C-alpha cells in the first residue's frame, strides 16, 4: 500500500508538476491537495488550481490566509497599490540593493508548509509536495525558497514525527 501524499497546489506549472509526480508515485487515490488564497491579486491562481484538480480528479481543500498577510506591503497582494514588476529578479534585486523583490510575501512558504502539515497529518498523509525551486531563491529574491529555508523541513519532521516534505527542486 502506498503512502498518502498532500500537494500544495497553486495551479501554476511547478505545483501542477508536483501533483502529476505525486499521482505517478502514490496513485491518484492516495493524493489530496491544498490550495491557499492569501489575498493575491491573481485570483486566477485559485481558478487554475481548481481546474487542475478537476482534470486529475483529485480531492482539494482550500484555505484562506488573507488576514495573516494584511500587514504586508507586497505588490502581489490585492490591498497593495504597487504594480507587480515586470523586470527580472536580477534587475529588481539590483534596484533594491539586494533586498527581497517586492513580490516576496513574507514567510508565505513557511505558513503554507505549516498549514499543509497540519491538514496532511489530519488526513494521514506522510508526504507533502510543493513547487519551490532554486530560481526563486537566486540572489535572495524569495528567502523562503532558499537552501537555508530547507530547515523548515526538519522542523516539520520534528513537529510531526511522520511527515516529510518533497520539494520540486529536490525530486530525483
Model-based region annotation:
Residues 2-172:
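ATP-dependent adenylation/nucleotidyltransferase module used to activate substrates
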Amino acid at each position: 500500500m502506498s503512502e498518502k501524499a498532500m500537494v500544495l497546489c497553486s495551479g501554476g506549472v511547478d505545483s501542477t508538476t508536483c501533483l502529476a509526480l505525486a499521482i505517478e508515485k502514490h496513485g491518484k487515490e492516495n493524493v489530496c491537495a491544498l490550495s491557499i488564497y492569501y489575498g493575491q491579486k491573481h485570483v486566477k491562481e485559485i481558478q487554475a488550481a481548481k481546474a487542475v484538480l478537476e482534470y486529475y480528479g483529485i480531492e482539494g481543500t482550500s484555505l484562506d490566509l488573507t488576514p495573516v498577510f494584511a500587514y504586508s506591503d507586497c505588490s502581489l497582494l490585492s490591498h497593495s497599490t504597487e504594480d507587480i514588476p515586470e523586470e527580472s529578479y536580477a534587475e529588481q534585486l539590483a534596484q533594491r540593493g539586494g533586498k527581497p523583490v517586492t513580490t516576496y510575501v513574507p514567510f508565505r512558504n513557511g505558513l503554507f508548509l505549516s498549514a499543509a502539515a497540519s491538514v496532511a497529518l489530519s488526513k494521514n498523509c506522510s508526504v507533502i509536495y510543493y513547487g519551490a525551486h532554486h530560481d526563486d531563491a537566486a540572489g535572495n529574491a524569495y528567502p523562503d525558497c532558499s537552501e537555508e529555508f530547507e530547515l523548515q523541513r526538519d522542523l516539520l519532521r520534528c513537529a510531526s514525527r511522520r511527515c516529510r516534505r518533497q520539494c520540486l527542486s529536490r525530486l530525483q
